[in-house]
Amino acid sequence: MKINIAKSSGFCFGVKRAIDLSIKLAEERKKVYVLGDIVHNSFVVSDLKKKGIKKISRIKPAVNSTLIIRAHGAPRKTFQKAIRSGYTIVDATCPKVKAIYKIAKHLEKHNTIIIIGDNNHAEVKGIAGQLETKPLTIETSKDLPLKKLRRVKKAAVITQSTQTIDNINAIMTCLKPIIPELKLYNTTCRTTRTKQQEIKSMPKENDIMLIIGSKRSANTKRLYQISKNINKKTYWIEHAGELESEWINNVESIGIMSGASTPDHVTQEVVRRLKPR
């Protein structure tokens, strides 16, 4: 049985940066907190907890404490509240996401901003939270806010960094007849595009596909969806313990793709379980 691991599997630049920054802070400072999960992966969150980093869900008054802003970013109000509450802020927001902030704020001056992304995702909330006016957020071409869209004369469309090109194109096709002046600024990151390009070929070349990553991970979800549409024998697992023996019976090749927040050791454990003993 041949096991083929995607070249783009595993951590993206922004995730690795946020984790490395957090570990360094844990070594240098005593009271270190992170608002929410630093990334969407339980193994990473657990490892950081063991190093002394405490996760909080709400900002409360603090003394001599450091607050890490997660890789997905956060609204401006979150930064302001943390400073008022006494925290020293260390911003681990992915630089690619910060670049989206800059683009969105610039475009807002003369456009209605439309975000193609998951409405409840931390990254999308962070982007929306940089703007003076609440943007319109669209998840799929099936949930267009038509009444609001028909009032828009000029719009700039930006994208959550992990969106698929197929979803973006489908939404843009629906928006073009509605909005007179419309321009797309595709702000999906390079790693996302690379992973999604690779996952379009791997399912054709392997008997089954394993997608490894958290069920809360947006980028992993999209990798799974793309692969599943091509190869029905695509399975989404978080760790090796979720492997089913029936999946690999009489299989000659297995393709593996790990999400952008999946540690290498998790992927390697899956590979070890798959190899015959």
Task: Pin down the residues of each PLM region.
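The feature marks the mature, well-folded catalytic cores of soluble enzymes
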Residues: 1-277
